[in-house]
């Protein structure tokens, strides 16, 4: 009975016996494309009375990594025997820290990307075979269990010989290419793309769905101005040439490029207002978006996106998902993003061990795409269900390099050296490095997946580490930014706001680990972080420099900052920070919600009650004090909310009755607008608010009061947020 063959190499002394050389089909059988019995001379040549010429083996395309590793281990063992210090390729197993040393498991090899924050303690390395076990293909062939390792083969396992006939003989090795080819042929011809986009309605002529040449280049320019600087998932020098060629021959565009072009149309329109769309293209934004999104779906079907292993097809899917975000329920979009992430994992862009054959350009574009995709997914999960986020220490894709697109050429074998000054990658790099820190942090994992804390980087003092991270980012990138440059301005204030959000989350994590009520000093620390979040967001929303980037700013509504401030103001209405807090909220409210549309009504109803309760606490305290001074002047935000509530109260009765009949709102009456409410901030439905612009999901913010189970209580009524069918109400209002 055959025994399983392991692909792992855990020791330096065990070497597998050499496999017998494969006998290739003879030259004549290859030319005639018939089966050769691989004897010499073969039966076919004997029967044809011709000379049988044995084919020569093609040169191996891949370097024999296994032989190199074996020799390297031998040299390392010799150095160890002679007590010569050196840096080993892999840390010996004996040097590993046990789980009992620090209470957590070690991080797999390479599982931490190389970011700015180099002061973090990097855990020891486990054996290579354990980490790469997930990359093995388990196949039961001829009674033998074959463990095929993607990154450790004999240099020829991944490819067939060019002239092989494809038949498997007794002397053949079972290679990954053979297994994969057989598996692919099993499902050949089965198109399952309808599972994602539905069955096509008749024949769709995609060439007729493209805009005119002038509009193609206008959309491309909008993409370069508004979208590309923030996402950086396409390589402008090479893609622009292809788009110019494609525009000159619309009917002969490859399916992958066509899908990418339509996704660029879609995401470009996302960054424009309706007035800009009418001025540039003579049509309404909604009309254009609907048409291009439908065409993009058909183009993605044409390139078999669900089976594709092409990075550019995945980029097209990602841009399409970004474009539909404002009008899509976050829970639904999260499900679609899981498909995109699974495709990315099948390609292997999350795993550095799969990059061996990639050029420098392809490697960098994969890094950029993975980080952009994961950060987008994390934000969507904040709005729906944090526990499904993929921002975790379970993969090892490196942070993108701080290099310009023109520094990356297709023929380059090695990547260029990163710049020490801001480049066009500034926003994407800084955002990725901050996300790289967060994904290893306990304050993030405690809310998303606490079990992953066992493999996260151990930080002795996360508060101090956050300060060090901010200092590192400031010194390496932000100190050289020009605030008059739009991208630099966007990077400065986005990162400062994101750091404040991380500090607030870390503050909650600390307070939730103790049953002792927070002190006033601790409360004031949280207030400072929340104020910083609001002030940074207001800077982004009011500056004319960010006009083209406003589509992404809308995506990050600072709802946790509002809730934190209002919670505190309700309990401490006359603290020293009260006036500053009301002013900061009023400034942000003026640019965020002063002109709220009908679509925002569900969110506004809830938000208005939280605000009015906090201000009523201030007024009640003034009355109770019986001061002779004039009553406090309501902030601008309170005045506007009261006006809107009065307008809504006059017309809300009929709308509420209709909603109750349809099951949209449970137990909501017109009078509820004037009654205090109790909010369950752990309800995921709340994250849908802000009219599609994206309120932050509140599950990780459930300990806003940090004082126990009643932390989410902002009122005294029986009305719970999770009794409202937000999606049904939103659909009715639209």
UniProtKB/Swiss-Prot annotation:
Gene3D superfamilies documented for this protein: Zn(2)-C6 fungal-type DNA-binding domain (4.10.240.10)
Biased composition (Basic and acidic residues): 86-107
Subcellular location: Nucleus
Biotechnology: Secalonic acids show unprecedented anticancer activities against various human cancer cells and might be interesting for further derivatization, targeting diseases such as cancer.
Major place of residence: nucleus
One GO-annotated biological process of the protein: positive regulation of metabolic process
Gene Ontology, cellular component aspect: nucleus
Task of the protein: Transcriptional regulator; part of the gene cluster that mediates the biosynthesis of the tetrahydroxanthone dimer secalonic acid D.
Protein name as catalogued: Transcriptional regulator AacuB
Organism, as annotated: Aspergillus aculeatus (strain ATCC 16872 / CBS 172.66 / WB 5094)
Lineage: Eukaryota, Fungi, Dikarya, Ascomycota, Pezizomycotina
């Amino acid at each position: 009975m055959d025994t399983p063959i392991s692909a792992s190499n855990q020791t330096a002394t065990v070497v597998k016996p050499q496999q017998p050389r494969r006998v290739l089909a003879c030259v004549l059988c290859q030319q005639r494309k018939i089966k050769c019995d691989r004897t010499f001379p073969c039966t076919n040549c004997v029967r044809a009375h011709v000379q049988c010429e044995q084919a020569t083996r093609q040169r191996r395309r891949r370097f024999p990594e296994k032989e190199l590793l074996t020799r390297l281990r031998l040299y390392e063992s010799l150095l160890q025997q002679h007590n010569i210090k050196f840096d080993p390729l892999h840390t010996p197993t004996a040097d590993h820290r046990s789980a009992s040393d620090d209470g957590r498991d070690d991080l797999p090899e390479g599982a931490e990307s190389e970011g700015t924050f180099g002061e973090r303690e990097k855990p020891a390395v486990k054996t290579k075979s354990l980490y790469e076990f997930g990359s093995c293909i388990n196949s039961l062939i001829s009674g033998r269990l074959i463990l095929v390792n993607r990154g450790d083969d004999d240099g020829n396992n991944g490819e067939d010989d060019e002239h092989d006939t494809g038949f498997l003989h007794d002397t053949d090795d079972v290679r990954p290419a053979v297994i994969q080819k057989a598996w692919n042929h099993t499902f050949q011809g089965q198109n399952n793309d309808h599972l994602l986009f539905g069955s096509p309605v008749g024949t769709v002529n995609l060439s007729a769905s493209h805009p005119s040449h002038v509009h193609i280049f206008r959309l491309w320019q909008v993409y370069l101005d508004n979208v590309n600087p923030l996402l950086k998932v396409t390589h402008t020098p090479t893609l622009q040439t292809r788009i110019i060629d494609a525009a000159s021959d619309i009917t002969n565009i490859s399916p992958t490029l066509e899908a990418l072009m339509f996704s660029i149309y879609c995401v470009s329109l996302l960054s424009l207002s309706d007035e800009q769309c009418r001025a540039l293209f003579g049509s309404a934004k909604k009309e254009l978006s609907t048409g291009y999104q439908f065409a993009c779906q058909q183009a993605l079907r044409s390139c078999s996106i669900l089976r594709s292993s092409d990075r550019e097809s995945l980029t097209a899917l990602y841009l399409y998902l970004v474009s539909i975000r404002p009008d899509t329920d976050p829970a639904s979009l999260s499900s679609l993003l899981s498909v995109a992430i699974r495709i990315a994992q099948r390609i292997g862009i999350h795993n550095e061990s799969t990059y061996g054959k990639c050029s420098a350009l392809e490697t960098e574009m994969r890094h950029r795409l993975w980080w952009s995709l994961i950060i987008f997914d994390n934000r969507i999960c904040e709005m729906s269900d944090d526990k499904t986020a993929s921002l975790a220490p379970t993969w090892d894709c490196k942070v993108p390099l701080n290099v310009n697109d023109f520094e990356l050429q297709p023929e380059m074998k090695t990547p260029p050296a990163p710049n020490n000054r801001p480049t066009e990658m500034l926003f994407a790099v800084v955002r990725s490095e901050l996300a790289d820190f967060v994904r290893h942090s306990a304050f993030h994992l405690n809310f998303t997946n606490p079990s992953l804390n066992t493999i996260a980087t151990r930080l002795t003092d996360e508060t101090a580490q956050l300060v060090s991270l901010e200092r590192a980012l400031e010194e390496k990138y932000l100190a050289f930014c020009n605030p008059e440059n739009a991208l630099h301005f966007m990077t400065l204030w986005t990162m400062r706001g994101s750091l404040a959000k991380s500090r607030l989350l870390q503050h909650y994590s600390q307070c939730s680990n103790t049953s002792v009520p927070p002190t006033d000093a601790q409360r004031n620390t949280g207030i400072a972080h929340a104020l910083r979040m609001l002030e940074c967001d207001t800077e982004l929303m009011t500056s004319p420099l960010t006009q083209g980037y406003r589509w992404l700013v809308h995506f990050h509504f600072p709802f946790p900052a509002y809730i934190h401030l209002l919670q505190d103001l309700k309990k401490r209405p006359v603290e020293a920070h009260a006036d500053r807090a009301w002013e900061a909220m009023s400034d942000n409210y003026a640019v965020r919600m002063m002109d709220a549309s009908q679509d925002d009504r569900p969110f506004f109803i809830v938000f208005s009650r939280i605000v009015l309760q906090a201000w009523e606490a201030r007024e009640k305290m003034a009355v109770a004090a019986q001061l002779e001074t004039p009553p406090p002047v309501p902030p601008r935000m309170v005045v506007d909310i009261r006006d809107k509530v009065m307008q809504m109260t006059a017309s809300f009765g009929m709308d509420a009755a209709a909603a109750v009949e349809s099951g949209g709102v449970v137990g909501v009456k017109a009078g509820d607008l004037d009654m205090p409410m109790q909010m369950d901030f752990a309800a995921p439905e709340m994250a849908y608010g802000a009219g599609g612009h994206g309120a932050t999901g509140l599950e990780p913010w459930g300990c806003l009061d940090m004082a126990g189970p009643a932390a989410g209580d902002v009122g005294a009524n029986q009305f719970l947020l999770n009794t409202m069918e937000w999606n049904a109400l939103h659909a009715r209002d639209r």
